[in-house]
Structures are given as structure tokens and as C-alpha cells.
Amino acid sequence: MGLEEKLPSGFLLTTVEGLAGYARKGSLWPATFGLACCAIEMMATTSGRFDLARFGMEAFRASPRQADLLIVAGRVSQKMGPVLRQVYDQMAEPKWVLAMGVCASSGGMFNNYAVVQGVDHIVPVDIYLPGCPPRPEMLLNAIIELHRKIQEMPLGVNREEARAAAERAALASTPTIDMKGLLR
């Protein structure tokens, strides 16, 4: 007989990681990094029609030290890249990044020297949200997907090793502007 048979019915069994993931996913504090038209759609998501508060995100944080989700909305110029990295480094662990819009994800239609071809060359991105600009419903769907990822994330040393390996791989990749292909 296992432990499950000896406990009274209705008794909840879970792992510490599962419980911590459930608590973390319901208490995300987003910081905005709105740089273009995607920021307007991000602001619309906080309105009563879409009700971002039901996901535990009542207010966007003004300081990165109070946030654990960075939503990069819009294109990032080369001069803004170090500022984005500084904001990311100031955030408390655990932290997540959502690249909102095609400009944040891959540079969008701005294929020139002045625009970073994807913020994943500056910070590690957890969720990519396509669209130009993506609708508030798509942002809500991306947040739900991020909740699923957070629920399944390991705790402690395993999480730190996985995060460090992902960041090293992303920063060591070839920049999109250096890639040669059919569109060049």
C-alpha cells in the first residue's frame, strides 16, 4: 500500500516544484520596454476589455527591480541594445522575457545596420510573439504559454544551469544581419 491509499480522500499531493511553479505563474510582475507600435497593443491589453488583471498582472512595474517579466515590444536600435541588457540585468531572478512583435523577434522590415535583428542577440527570450503588431488576444495567449513554461520549470541549480546554457547558445549564434540567404 502506498501513501496515496492511506491518506483520506480529498488530500492534495504535489511536488514542491509543482507548487512553486503554480505560485510563480500566478504572480508575474511585468515591466514594459515599449519602443514602437506594439507598445500600443500592449497598453490595450491592460484595458477592461481584455483584463490582464485576471492573470495576476494588475499593474506594469516602473522599475526593473520590481519585475520578473520583461515584455520587449517593438524594434530595438543598436544604441538601445545596451540599455535593454542593463534593464534585464537589473531584474530579480527568476526572470522571463517576451519578444512582442516581429520587430522584436527578428528585426521585422527594418533590415539595416541601425536595428538589432532580434532581441535574442541581447537577452535570452522565453516566448516569441509574431505579428505586426500582434493583437491583445495574441499577447494574452503568449502569457498563457509562458505560464505553462513556468509551471514546468525546475527549481534551484537545474534551472540555473539550463538558463546559463540557453543564454550562452543564444549570444553565440550568428546575427541575422550576417546570415546569407535568399532575401539578401
From Swiss-Prot:
Cofactor: [4Fe-4S] cluster
GO biological process, one term: electron transport coupled proton transport
Coiled coil regions in record: none
Cofactor comment: Binds 1 [4Fe-4S] cluster.
Pfam families with a match to the protein in the record: Oxidored_q6
Topology within the bilayer: Peripheral membrane protein
Keywords: 4Fe-4S, Cell membrane, Iron, Iron-sulfur, Membrane, Metal-binding, NAD, Quinone, Translocase, Transport
GO cellular component, one term: respiratory chain complex I
Superkingdom of this protein's organism: Bacteria
Main location: membrane
Binding positions ([4Fe-4S] cluster): C37, C38, C103, C132
Subunit organization: NDH-1 is composed of 14 different subunits. Subunits NuoB, C, D, E, F, and G constitute the peripheral sector of the complex.
Family to which the UniProt record says this protein belongs: Belongs to the complex I 20 kDa subunit family.
Annotated NCBIfam families: nuoB_fam, PRK06411.1
Function: NDH-1 shuttles electrons from NADH, via FMN and iron-sulfur (Fe-S) centers, to quinones in the respiratory chain. The immediate electron acceptor for the enzyme in this species is believed to be a menaquinone. Couples the redox reaction to proton translocation (for every two electrons transferred, four hydrogen ions are translocated across the cytoplasmic membrane), and thus conserves the redox energy in a proton gradient.
Alphabetized PANTHER family for the sequence: NADH DEHYDROGENASE, NADH DEHYDROGENASE [UBIQUINONE] IRON-SULFUR PROTEIN 7, MITOCHONDRIAL
Protein name per Swiss-Prot or TrEMBL: NADH-quinone oxidoreductase subunit B
Protein source organism: Rhodococcus erythropolis (strain PR4 / NBRC 100887)
Gene (name only): nuoB
